[in-house]
């Protein structure tokens, strides 16, 4: 049976082909070069995590596993709420078919605050990296479960060329080994959610954290964090940086919820 990553890859490749037909790579590069310099995603996380926790706060309307998460969806207001609550960075979904995201959400959210922003999407072509920069993104995501080694290297090089940071995402030891071997970016995210089954367990971070920290990389714990107790449990294994979306997106007062989560 086709898993979700296979389905997403199929429609993403179609999206990229259509985008290239609309906007040439040369025109897209011109748009990217016209953007203000990147805000420094990894550095913002470092500064916040040195004082407590570094939070990548996610702006996400829906997901394949949970459906609609936030009916009252206002990206600029959410970005300001996250900033007021003490987040270090934003993560904004730009995938439409599976997450009801959009490039306009990334643009609007980043313009509404001073935080660096990650384009949260499934990338398979350097064209998408240039898109991210043209939309103002300061960081991209490379999901090791969805790309081969050579493509991961190509995407990282493209991001570095634009002055962007890279968040590398892994879910198991094999993906981590590949990331450590082929990629140089310091931010290494552990997704506690299996993207093929959607099962979530914090044991994934517990298992991989020692290796990541021993290699001198900067651990980011992703998915499955809902309470201060969850954060404390992950901090006990060395996590000081977190990517959190759903639990905050479901709160009426996002700024207060963010503040409370970071106060633990």
Swiss-Prot record:
InterPro entries: Aldolase_TIM, Indole-3-glycerol_P_synth, Indole-3-glycerol_P_synth_dom, Indole-3-GlycerolPSynthase_CS, RibuloseP-bd_barrel. Its EC number is 4.1.1.48. Keywords: Amino-acid biosynthesis, Aromatic amino acid biosynthesis, Decarboxylase, Lyase, Tryptophan biosynthesis. The keyword Heme does not apply. It catalyses: 1-(2-carboxyphenylamino)-1-deoxy-D-ribulose 5-phosphate + H(+) = (1S,2R)-1-C-(indol-3-yl)glycerol 3-phosphate + CO2 + H2O. Pathway: Amino-acid biosynthesis; L-tryptophan biosynthesis; L-tryptophan from chorismate: step 4/5. Pfam families: IGPS. One of its GO terms (molecular function) is phosphoribosylanthranilate isomerase activity. It comes from the Bacteria. One of its GO terms (biological process) is L-tryptophan biosynthetic process. The keyword Lyase applies. PROSITE patterns: IGPS. It is an enzyme of class 4 (lyase). Belongs to the TrpC family. NCBIfam families: PRK00278.1-2, PRK00278.1-6, PRK00278.2-4. This is Indole-3-glycerol phosphate synthase. The lineage of its organism: Bacteria, Pseudomonadati, Pseudomonadota, Alphaproteobacteria, Rhodobacterales.
């Amino acid at each position: 049976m086709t898993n979700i990553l296979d389905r997403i890859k199929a429609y993403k490749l179609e999206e990229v082909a259509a985008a290239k037909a609309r906007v040439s790579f040369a025109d897209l590069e011109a748009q990217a070069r016209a953007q203000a310099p990147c805000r420094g995603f990894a550095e913002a996380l470092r500064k916040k995590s040195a004082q407590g926790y570094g939070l990548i706060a996610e702006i996400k309307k829906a997901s394949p596993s949970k459906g609609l998460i936030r009916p009252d969806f206002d990206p600029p207001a959410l970005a300001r709420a996250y900033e007021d609550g003490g987040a270090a960075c934003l993560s904004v979904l730009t995938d439409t078919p599976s997450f009801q995201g959009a490039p306009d959400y990334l643009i609007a959210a980043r313009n509404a605050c001073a935080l660096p922003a990650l384009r949260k999407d499934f990338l398979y072509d350097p064209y998408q990296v240039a898109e991210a920069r043209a939309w103002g993104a300061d960081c991209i995501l490379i999901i090791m479960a969805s790309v081969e080694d050579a493509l991961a290297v190509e995407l990282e090089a493209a991001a570095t060329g634009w002055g962007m940071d890279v968040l590398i995402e892994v879910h198991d030891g094999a993906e981590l080994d590949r990331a450590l071997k082929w990629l140089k970016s310091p931010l290494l995210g552990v997704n506690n959610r299996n993207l093929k089954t959607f099962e979530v367990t914090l044991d994934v971070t517990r298992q991989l954290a020692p290796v990541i920290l021993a290699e001198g990389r900067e651990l980011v714990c992703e998915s499955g964090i809902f309470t201060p107790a969850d954060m404390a449990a992950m901090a006990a294994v060395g996590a000081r940086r977190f990517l959190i979306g759903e639990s905050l997106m479901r709160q009426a007062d996002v700024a207060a919820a963010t503040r409370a989560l970071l106060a633990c």
